[in-house]
């Protein structure tokens, strides 16, 4: 369920946060919880703000999990949870969230596949990382291709270095 009146406020909060008024943006988002405490998009925005604009990872995780709980088919919180878990070196959990999100309707497949590849790269499973970078390349016709190619090259170099000595 999407609430148009709420989306106006979510956009306002985003603009405040982008303009380095993080406290004001978060305050607006928190106040909206009184109106719609079970709105997945709202919890996703709050989790996004805490994850990328504050050091409070616990709040980010809580709100992203609430977003998924309130709407399990909404893809963005899975992507943000993947990022959060990668930052926390919780790679197994990250892959689980990213795999679930990848299969949601309207998921940004390239972003999910790219993050899954990064997890495998960090776990030093370079073959799997390369496989996911390639899958991401197949899923795009856009600007991401160069970045994904760099990921493949980087994994090949790391694999060569790890196994040549």
Task: Show where each model-derived region lies.
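Canonical tetratricopeptide repeat
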Residues: 45, 80, 115, 149-151
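Alpha-helical segment of the N-proximal tetratricopeptide repeat
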Residues: 5-35, 51
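Short coil turns that delineate tetratricopeptide repeat
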Residues: 37, 72, 106-107, 141-143
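Structural signature of tandem alpha-helical TPR/SEL1-like repeats
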Residues: 18-28, 53-66, 88-100, 124-132, ...
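TPR alpha-solenoid repeat register
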Residues: 42, 77, 111-112, 145-148
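Terminal, low-structured helical/coil segments at or just beyond the last alpha-helical repeat
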Residues: 1-3, 130-165
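Residue-level recognition of tetratricopeptide repeat
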Residues: 14, 48-49, 83, 118, ...
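Conserved structural position within tetratricopeptide repeats
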Residues: 31-34, 65-69, 99-104, 138
């Amino acid at each position: 369920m999407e609430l148009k009146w709420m989306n106006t406020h979510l956009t306002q909060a985003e603009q405040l946060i982008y303009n380095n008024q993080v406290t004001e943006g978060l305050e607006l988002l928190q106040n909206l919880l009184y109106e719609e405490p079970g709105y997945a998009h709202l919890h996703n925005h709050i989790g996004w703000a805490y994850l990328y604009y504050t050091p409070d990872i616990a709040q980010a995780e809580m709100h992203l999990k609430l977003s998924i709980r309130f709407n399990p088919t909404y893809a963005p919180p899975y992507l943000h949870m993947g990022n959060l878990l990668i930052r926390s070196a919780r790679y197994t959990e990250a892959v689980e969230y990213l795999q679930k999100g990848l299969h949601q309707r309207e998921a940004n497949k390239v972003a999910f596949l790219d993050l899954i590849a990064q997890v495998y790269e960090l776990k030093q499973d370079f073959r799997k990382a390369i496989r996911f970078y390639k899958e991401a390349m197949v899923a795009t016709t856009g600007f991401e291709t160069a970045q994904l190619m760099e990921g493949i090259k980087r994994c090949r170099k790391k694999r060569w270095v790890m196994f040549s000595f």
